[in-house]
């Protein structure tokens, strides 16, 4: 699953410009976003495309208790079949901007965080689906996950779907039928992402500052983790 990600203000602005969104959402850089966080989400076709604040954790329209029914992720392999996701896939697709995301390696009973971000090029346009919050609150969304790319596979078997620019345009086009878009939900090619072992501060969701991205140092941080995974 994808359980934490980073969004820097400058990356948000860059991706919104790429997607043709004129109104830049009010947002301060955050370095440890987790389910239930309120974050920018892009939806709709050009030229009426907008960025809105939405809550991570999709609440199905039939949920009796929204707080207990949040779905942070939807698997690409089953998103078209599951009742909780099927209608959103057809009618309510979105892109969630991200600078990068975290995954954890389990080693000796310890959780060691790794940060994955593009080596170069634009920020990540993560594929999502959303539901209207109605009178109860903001829209809610789930990130779609797929099998891991090579840089990630040694740590975790899943990753969020990151869409290239043309794929992001197709994903946001309501005239595109969902079955035609399913082939877009695939891993990134090898070499796109850089992997860095980072501070265990990110293990605690209350830590949201830029120090979450500091490289792991000292014996307690196991600074040789990058060599051990062959991801240098």
Place the predicted regions along the sequence by residue:
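Short linear sequence motif anchored by a di-proline
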Residues: 1-232
